[in-house]
Amino acid sequence: MILVVWQTLALAIQVGAVLLSLRDHEGIAGVVSVVGFAIAFASALWVLTRPQLTRAARNTAVICLGITPAVMWHSTNLLMFTGFDEQLHMRTLRDIISSHRLFEANPILGVSPQYPGLEALTVLLHQTGLPTMVAAWVVILLCRLALVTVLCDAVEQLTGDVRAGGIAVAAYAVSPQFVFFNSQFSYQTLALPLALAAVSLLARARTSDYPVRLFLGATVCLCGVAVTHHVTSFLTATFLILWTLVETGQSRLRVLYGALVAVASALAWAMVQWSLLQDYFGPIFDDIASQLGGGMRRKPFEDAAGSASPLWERLLLLYYALALTALVAALAVYAFSRWGRRILGPPEHRPQRWLPSLMLLSLVMLLPVLLAARVVPKGGEIFDRSSSFLFLPFSLLVGRYAVRFWWLEPRRPHAEGYRHPPLSRAVAIVLAALMFLGGYILGSGADWSRLPGPYQVSADSRSMDSEVLAAVAWSRDNLEPGSRISADRVNSTLFSAEAGLWPINEFRGRDTPSLYFGDDWGDKETETARILQLRYLYVDRRLADELPRLGSYFMVGETSGGQQLTDWELTKFDTVPGIELLYRHGPISIYDLQGLGVKELRNGWYGETPTVSLVTQLAIGLLGGLLIGLTLHSRLRPRLAAPARLWYEDAGPALTLATALAGATLFSIVLLLLHIWLTPTAFAVAAGLVVLINPGRTATLIRAGMTRVRWRQVAAGSLLAVPIAGVHGVAAASAADRDIFQVQRILDDPVAFHASPTTTGASK
């Protein structure tokens, strides 16, 4: 309970930092925010390093490590996702909800609709009656819970030590993507725990007397990964192939099964999307090759606009790099000191040449190498993306060897359970917390990106202020969905996800940045607009205030050098005949280019949302309720309950949760492919029918559940719920003021200019 109090304090500190940043105290707010994250991590690690650690305390600390940082990161805006990638996936999610079907085109991230696992799971929760944002939030928290609990369980199973699982989660928390990337609404957030669960199930199957149940769970998880994230599915298949090569005996055949399933599911789903995957990966590989060959280098501790990180952040990043390198080196030395002779010794002393531990260590040793590769622009992205996967074996080795090194092994006679005095423990926790902060800062980007504040150019969340949101809201209500629009990089995602428009950057050899860069508008620009079939043009005069924070205003390669837009370039549209002003407030204008002879083309989903009749909803609910209720009432129930009980005994709660997430994802995708749309009415009818068919069993389950409730803990939790709810209420009120009330004031401002566009027929 004390740990939860500290976690609540950390969340309150983060919300306080958000409020400070909004009041132009960004420097102090950044320090306060980091202190909050340090408290969240250190308090959990303090519990994990207790001399006497119970499983309940370990589980509480592990859950806090997974949930609290994610909530703290999103506390900057609880009402909307402000990440660039998150808005891309929100477009895919809203297309599914609007069209009731899969695979509607995404204008910015074409591969997203082809891997709809995350969105399908969110849709299934939304169909129960949850609002869209609440359903998305539930998915994120479930994924975070599955990630840390599956990792903890896997390490405990491999090491046989309760503490090792918790230490492994703490070690994984220092990865750069743990706080930011793997807690956002993006497909890797779901795919990563599913992949880890599949690997863990296969690890258990190696020594199981009846591995079929575990194979089934691994198959469900691997298929869930295959339909959720292309990169994770490919990397999982590659890892399982390598694992098969280094395994021996009967275990090799069991791991081989997982490798075959991973390869088959990944390739089967990817073959359909091959052209999109080429478009996705091709530019990345070309960009990396040009940077490595052309000598491009990034300036350390600076963003693309030249803004430098504070000194204390630089010191934390340097400490992180040194600590990570030293820790990897220590792992290598310690590992080789324990089992190196079996690898390098005489043949009679090494029955197997390649050990799985050596494979894991080899993967871990890539971390310092890729960290050094951050000197090139794409090197940072490669390290950040790969760290989510490479830190998994890192955490396993740290959990295994930290327990052996720090705590005496129980096999040794007359040994105390704890080797070091409390001062050493405190110093170790401080050093680990500093490393956690270094990873958090490295993965979350520049200091300005971690907290809200005044508008900045091409700065992701800092480019989504009330002025921008008001323009997007007006466009959603007044512009035809699917219409083509040009906008800067960040706001293109908002127009796509929130307004249903179709942002476009280039088409048939022409691009939209050329319309902005240049002092005049001539025949060439008019021809470009016609070729692009560009109906609307979005302009924010603040783009001329500075260079883009993340390297480009619109897209990579928009100009030959770091050219800054000027105010004249962004105001020239007012004097061009044929360009009509539709919206203006403050620095933002939206123009209609139809007067230039642009033939309108609408893309993506822009139809009416299909209606599901009440009869259909009742029929689906009745069929589902009868199927489940009669099954539970029949002789099939014990036949199904026995395998389920055995599965739970074999897999445990963490892997059961991950497998359930994968199964729900696949179930939702199948329903969408069959054009079956569930509704809250269908769920309510089905649940009511199950209760009516099985009243006695329902009452028994309720009584059994009530007897298992620990009412003292419920009372204590209720007391803590009040301050937790208060902190979230403050954060939500702050977000509502920016996202709702200020937006409405802008839309109602009498000095704003609003005009209705001319409606014309459009082709698709």
Describe each region flagged by the PLM:
Residues 1-56, 596-711, 717, 732-735:
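Membrane-embedded, hydrophobic transmembrane alpha-helices
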Residues 4-7, 188, 400, 404-623, ...:
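Extracytoplasmic
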Residues 30-35, 181, 188, 234, ...:
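Hydrophobic/aromatic-rich transmembrane helices and adjacent perimembrane loops
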Residues 51, 56-61, 68-193, 389, ...:
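Active-site lumenal/periplasmic loops and adjacent helix-entry segments of GT-C-fold
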Residues 51, 208-212, 250-257, 329-365, ...:
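Membrane-interface helix-loop-helix junctions at transmembrane boundaries of multi-pass membrane enzymes
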Residues 59-67, 218, 239, 260-261, ...:
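Transmembrane alpha-helix segments characteristic
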Residues 63-70, 118, 122, 140-244, ...:
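Membrane-embedded helix bundles of polyisoprenyl
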Residues 85, 186-191, 213-216, 220-340, ...:
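Transmembrane catalytic cores of multi-pass membrane glycosyltransferases
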